[in-house]
Regions:
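Positively charged, low-complexity terminal tracts
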Residues: 18-142
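Bacterial Sec-dependent N-terminal signal peptides
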Residues: 1-20
Length: 142
């Protein structure tokens, strides 16, 4: 009888320790581009931590679909990305913004306008000035 009573009292504590509920949410901030070469900026919240990710299909390989993720550990890191885009927008052809985990290069193409090449962790994508403006506006709202 004592063993049964002890089992009834201890089992809820043991069971609670085995199951952990994690609150997490992924919110799409902006779909920069859709279609064959998508780019999206997302906010991921887990418990009290928030990080941001830029997901894109790498353009290095035309025959396979490889989605790369550039992770920003907090809003401050995301703001640095925005500042890099803003500095390149005001800059000239060939300017480069280098960060620890990624690099953005401005490329001016005659008749096509300004575009940017983002490289990170073996992935590469490009985007046009209107897409960069959409990202900067979305980051500014955060």
């Amino acid at each position: 009888m004592k063993n049964l009573l002890l089992l009834i009292l201890i089992s809820p504590m043991v069971m609670k320790a085995q199951f952990k509920i994690v609150n997490s949410a992924t919110i799409n901030i902006v779909d920069v581009r859709q279609g064959t070469w998508p780019i999206s900026l997302q906010r991921i919240t887990k418990q009290s931590d928030t990080c941001f990710v830029l997901q894109f299909r790498t353009q290095e390989y035309n025959n396979s679909v490889i989605i790369k993720t550039l992770k920003f550990r907090d809003l401050e890191q995301l703001k640095y990305f925005q500042q890099g885009l803003a500095a390149l927008k005001a800059g000239n052809n060939g300017d480069v913004a280098e960060f620890k985990d990624y690099t953005i290069k401005r490329v001016d193409v005659y008749k096509a306008g300004t575009s940017y090449i983002l490289t990170c962790d073996g992935g590469l994508t490009n985007f046009q000035q209107p897409e960069a403006d959409r990202m900067m506006a979305a980051i500014k709202k955060q």
